[in-house]
C-alpha cells in the first residue's frame, strides 16, 4: 500500500488585509489549524509575483491528507476565526491534494 497524498491549504492575498481583523483572525486561526494537524510551511510576506501574480502575503500549510486539510477548514475552531476575520481579507484560498 502506497503513502497517502498530503493535503494542503494555500492562502494568497489579493490585496492588503485589514490589519486589526487579520491580527484577531491569526490569533484564532493558527492554533485551530495546528491543533488539526497543520504544519505551516510558509508564511511569506516577501513574495516575487510572476505570471499575473500579486505581491501580497502567501500562506502554505501541510496536512497528513486532503481530508484532514478539509476537516481543519470546516472545524468549529477555524470557523470562529473566519467569523472574526469578517471580510477583512480578500484571498484566493484553496484546499488541495498533493502528489
Protein language model features and the residues they cover:
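Short S/T/G/P-rich N-terminal loop/turn motif that feeds into the first structured element of a domain
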Residues: 1-57, 64-70, 74, 97-99
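C-terminal structural segments of small proteins and small subunits
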Residues: 69-94
Amino acid at each position: 500500500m502506497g503513502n497517502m497524498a498530503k493535503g494542503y491549504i494555500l492562502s494568497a492575498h489579493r490585496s492588503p488585509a485589514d490589519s486589526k481583523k487579520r491580527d484577531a483572525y491569526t490569533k484564532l486561526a493558527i492554533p485551530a489549524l495546528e491543533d488539526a494537524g497543520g504544519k505551516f510551511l510558509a508564511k511569506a510576506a516577501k513574495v516575487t509575483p510572476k505570471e499575473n501574480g500579486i505581491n501580497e502575503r502567501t500562506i502554505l500549510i501541510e496536512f497528513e491528507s486532503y481530508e484532514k486539510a478539509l476537516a481543519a477548514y470546516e472545524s468549529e475552531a477555524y470557523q470562529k476565526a473566519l467569523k472574526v476575520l469578517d471580510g477583512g481579507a480578500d484571498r484566493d484560498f484553496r484546499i488541495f491534494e498533493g502528489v
